[in-house]
Structure formats: structure tokens, C-alpha cells
Curated annotation (Swiss-Prot):
Taxonomic source organism: Nitrosococcus oceani (strain ATCC 19707 / BCRC 17464 / JCM 30415 / NCIMB 11848 / C-107)
Gene coding for it: pdxJ
Superkingdom of origin: Bacteria
Record family assignment: Belongs to the PNP synthase family.
The protein's Enzyme Commission number: 2.6.99.2
Name of the protein described by the UniProt record: Pyridoxine 5'-phosphate synthase
Amino acid sequence: MIASHAILLGVNIDHVATLRQARGTRYPDPIQAAIEAEQAGADGITLHLREDRRHIQERDVALLRDVLVSKMNLEMAVTGEMLAIAEKYCPEDCCLVPERREELTTEGGLNVTGQLARITEACVRLKEAGTRVSLFIDADPRQVEAAAQANAPVIEIHTGHFADARDERNRRKEFQRIVEAVKRGREVGLQVNAGHGLNYQNVAAIAALSDIVELNIGHAIIARALFTGMQSAVGEMKRLMREARE
């Protein structure tokens, strides 16, 4: 499954906003981070507007719409409020994710099979607004097939279980689940992206899967940027992804 075509990088800027919100200041500015990420080669900017507004604020979404050169991938829960916000700002991409207020970060994939009608309706609304929909799902063929039934053109495979595996046996097991989910996604005609928990040590294995179009990575890049700067951190991730396809 290794190929030479390029793989895209969406840089998630949520944790720049996390640092800002920790003190309620105007800095660091996630908008500046997005601009620097683009200058370093990011193919898109991802941000998650959570219901509790713990990091990204609606104002950030509005400002980014005016300055992004690449594309916006807005992550959000499947709620009436969030759908209305997406319809207001019309991001190029919108990734529907599960959300629980008590979680530190998104802990698992969307249960598409358990709420097919609701997610299908959300996909219709977003498509009518001119936004391409992605569903963030676990590496489960049943969820992949349900995503296709919901008429979502894109899925993002949750790579967190692979990234968090404590030993090589479990890591191989989770990797194989991803491989099978990617294969099933292509069989049912979906674009397949991936993300969550990817870092400079584990990204190559996922980036080497030729049927994956885009990786969305945030925490590892922002953490590296604290020491090396945003452009260097993004550039290094792009290099690792590119080399995995060579």
C-alpha cells in the first residue's frame, strides 16, 4: 500500500488557543499560528469549535475565514448550534466528531451506526451549504459502511488507539485495523483521511498507507513548535510524511 503520490497535512491549531485560554489573554494567537503553518507547507488548517468553547472561539473561526490561503477543516459536534455556525461560515471541510464535556480530547470515533438518520441529515445540510463533510470514526468496517450510507464523501480514521498502544503486539493489531478500515473505505467510494495522536515517531507508518489522502495533526506539532518554532515543526512533519511515500 505504499505509493509515491503526495499526502496532505492539515495542522490543528486548537492547542495554541488552549494556551491562550489558560490565562484569558489575547496571545498566543491561533490565527498567527495558522498563517505560519501555511507558510511552512500546511495544506489546510483544522480547528475544533467545542460546545464548551474550551479553546477555539467562534471569533477565531470568523477571523480564519478571512485570512486562510489553503482550506479550513472545522471539527464540531452534531448539534443544531454547530450546524448553524458551519452554515454561517461555510468552511471548505467540516469533520463531525463525538463530544463529551468531561473528556480531555476526543476519545473515540463517531457512532454513525447508532445515529444514522441524524448524521445523514447533518450531511445533507452541510452539503447544501457548500461544505464537504467528513466523519471521524473508529477503524471499524461497520462504521465505514454506515458513513457511506449517510452520504458523507470523506471519513477520518481515528488513529488514537494505534498511537496509544503500550506494546508492539497491540500496536500491530491496531495498525491492521486501520489498514482494513482504509481498504473498506476505498471499496465503498470514500476519501480516507486519518488523525489523532500522531506524532514525529509514529506518523511514518500511517503516512505510508497509499490510500490515505490527508493526515490531521495538532498536539505534537504545537508541542514541537514551543521549542523549534511553528514553521520548523510543520516542515519537519511534512518531511516525515513525504519520505514515508517515497
